[in-house]
């Protein structure tokens, strides 16, 4: 069987993708830290596709933003713990495409990670696809998966 191609092997594309993902993750962190959906969603494309950690598929900025705005308007006891975002892996299969795995770690009141066996609060692993248009990076798609113990 012939060897399959590597899609993320251009160092210039990868450097640009890493910078874009770092900036995007910093924006998510700032939005969640301040409870501001405008900041959190600042670079979600108008036609963003979003997979929620509860299995819903949402399409369009207005739909996703309205959910995040309601979520951030709730008191912390309802919205959940504070969080820390961590970039796990970045790929650049093209000059204007970044694909990233980003972990959201749920934190307790002391800033320590909440265990994966907690039934009400959970961390997530997200897969984000960013696309550059007119020198600006936009989130085209995101899929969020709760991190849970193996069954």
How does the language model describe each region?
Residues 2-38, 49-151:
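A beta-strand edge to alpha-helix "cap/lid" segment located at domain peripheries
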Residues 45:
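Helix-to-beta-strand junctions that scaffold the AdoMet/dcAdoMet cofactor pocket
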């Amino acid at each position: 069987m012939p060897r399959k191609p590597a899609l993320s092997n251009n160092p210039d594309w990868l450097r640009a993708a890493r910078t874009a993902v770092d900036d995007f993750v910093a924006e998510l962190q700032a939005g969640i830290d301040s409870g501001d959906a405008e900041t959190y969603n600042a670079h979600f494309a108008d036609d963003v596709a979003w997979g929620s950690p509860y299995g819903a598929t949402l399409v369009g900025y207005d739909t996703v933003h309205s959910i995040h705005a309601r979520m951030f308007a709730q008191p912390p006891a309802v919205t959940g713990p504070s969080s820390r975002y961590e970039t796990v892996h970045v790929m650049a299969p093209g000059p204007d495409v970044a694909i990233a795995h980003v972990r959201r770690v749920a934190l307790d009141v002391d800033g320590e990670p909440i265990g994966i066996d907690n039934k009400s609060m959970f961390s997530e692993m997200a897969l984000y696809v960013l696309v550059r248009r007119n020198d600006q990076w936009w989130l085209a798609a995101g899929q969020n998966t709760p991190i849970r113990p193996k069954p």
